[in-house]
A protein has these predicted regions:
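Surface-exposed, charge/polar-rich loops and edge strands
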Residues: 1-198
């Protein structure tokens, strides 16, 4: 099975750039222009060198008490406590951070096959009604630092299992935005350095 992932909007950006450049070219120039092609990397999903990393969420300008009440209303079978549940079988578990407090949130009435999808469904609904903006953050330490501010609420997500990827696409369709990252953020400088094509 082959799959195409559009990480960091790479393919969408490449297509948009190409369509803009193409307008300035003759058909002969367009036929041989390097921007016509997207650089891709073919990898084996199960290769040990390919590491999945979670992409966490931080909601800026939010109220922790309102967020907790909203979580309890959105998920019907929910457990929120300062310690992780002893038995997590059949549960999706993530961590909520606010003002130095850590709460473990576990649910059984998941909205997606992946924990990140269930949380994203909640955040999408919550932010339709309440104030705040969400950002997608790499690294536990960064989330913990941001959530020392009492107006920020962070959600630490588990690393998605590789064997859940295709199953989730079958069950849920498209993956939620920013589901996972392949590698650590500090190792991905090439995204910034490899953008310019003339």
């Amino acid at each position: 099975v082959s799959a195409v992932g559009d990480g960091n909007h790479s393919l969408a950006t490449a297509k948009t750039c190409w369509n803009e450049i193409k307008k300035t070219l003759t058909p002969e120039e367009a036929a041989v222009h390097p921007a016509r092609y997207a650089l891709v990397e073919v990898v084996n999903l199960h290769d040990d060198s390919l590491k999945f990393e979670p992409i966490h969420r931080v909601v800026f300008g939010a109220d922790a008490a309102k967020m907790t009440v909203a979580l309890a209303g959105f998920f019907k079978d929910i457990f929120i406590a300062p310690k992780p549940p002893k038995d997590i079988a059949g549960r999706q578990v993530f961590v909520m951070l606010s003002n130095g407090n850590k709460q473990y949130v576990s649910v059984t009435d998941e909205k997606s096959n992946l924990t990140v999808g269930s949380l994203q469904a909640f955040l999408d609904e919550y932010l339709k009604k309440e104030t705040g903006t969400v950002d997608y953050i790499h690294g536990d330490e960064v989330v913990e630092r941001l959530c020392k501010n009492p107006e920020n609420i962070g959600f630490l997500l588990p690393t998605p299992a590789k064997d859940e990827l295709f199953k989730t696409v079958v069950l849920d369709g498209a993956l939620p935005r920013k589901t996972f990252s392949m590698g650590h953020a500090q190792d991905k400088r090439f995204y910034l350095e490899g953008r310019k094509i003339r």
